[in-house]
Amino acid sequence: MRIDVVTLNPRIIESASEEGILKQALKKGLLELFVHQLRDYARDKHKTVDDRPYGGGPGMVLKCEPIFEAVEAIGWCKDKDTVVCPSPSGIKFDQQLAKDLSKRNRLIFICGQYEGIDQRVIDQLVDLEICIGDYILSSGTIAALVIIDSVVRLIPGVLGNQDSILDESFEDFLLEGPQYTRPRKFRDWEVPAVLLSGDHRRILLWRKRLSEEKTEKMRKDLWEARKKGERI
């Protein structure tokens, strides 16, 4: 997979690529990651990328020209590439959407800043606006990194143990159940006996039951979707 990120904050992505999942994917040759400083595509000597909004209002809006220049300069192909813009106006990001994106050949992220992006960019370039949650971030680049991390770990071969993906939260609309490791007893708290029984069927049923109980208690939206067989 190839991922391009057009941003005013390239170090957010670059520093993340030096650690964890992104580093593994790059090292294994399963990911190509290119980060593009938006200011490099501004035409004027001041490298201006934003301006006041028409009609008035607070803040500044990212301009069309540098964004179009950037996306076109990196070889954007409208019919093959998926252009993503993290945005409060977007569809809700979830595990199923992460899976869908992990199967794409190339993702191009346009990261907003300030009061947002000129709507003509959204209308003409963007295929998918994605919202990672109902809260405000200082930069769309942070949201893009969340999406990228979630997507890249689903690329076959990135994780050392692909089976671990099947046991994670949100698979089959369930939160992952409790996990324990050594020591067997810490202070007055012991590991549940069933996990020490060696009976794999009992352990599987126990984990499923606690996973269901946790989901019903903590995420009623997931629980209801599971019962209905719907996508969150």
Swiss-Prot record:
- What sections of the sequence does the record tag as coiled-coil? none
Compartments, record wording: Cytoplasm
> What EC number(s) does its UniProt record assign?
2.1.1.228
Q: Which keywords has UniProt assigned to this entry? A: Cytoplasm, Methyltransferase, S-adenosyl-L-methionine, Transferase, tRNA processing
The reactions it catalyses are:
guanosine(37) in tRNA + S-adenosyl-L-methionine = N(1)-methylguanosine(37) in tRNA + S-adenosyl-L-homocysteine + H(+)
Return the Pfam families for the record: tRNA_m1G_MT (PF01746)
Annotated S-adenosyl-L-methionine binding sites: 112, 132-137
In the record, biological process GO terms are: tRNA N1-guanine methylation
Q: Name one GO molecular function term.
A: tRNA (guanine(37)-N1)-methyltransferase activity
Q: What does this protein do?
A: Specifically methylates guanosine-37 in various tRNAs.
Q: Which HAMAP family match?
A: TrmD (MF_00605)
Subunit structure as annotated in this protein's UniProt entry: Homodimer.
PANTHER family annotated for this entry? TRNA (GUANINE-N(1)-)-METHYLTRANSFERASE
Q: What is this protein called?
A: tRNA (guanine-N(1)-)-methyltransferase
Q: What is the lineage of its organism?
A: Bacteria, Pseudomonadati, Verrucomicrobiota, Methylacidiphilae, Methylacidiphilales
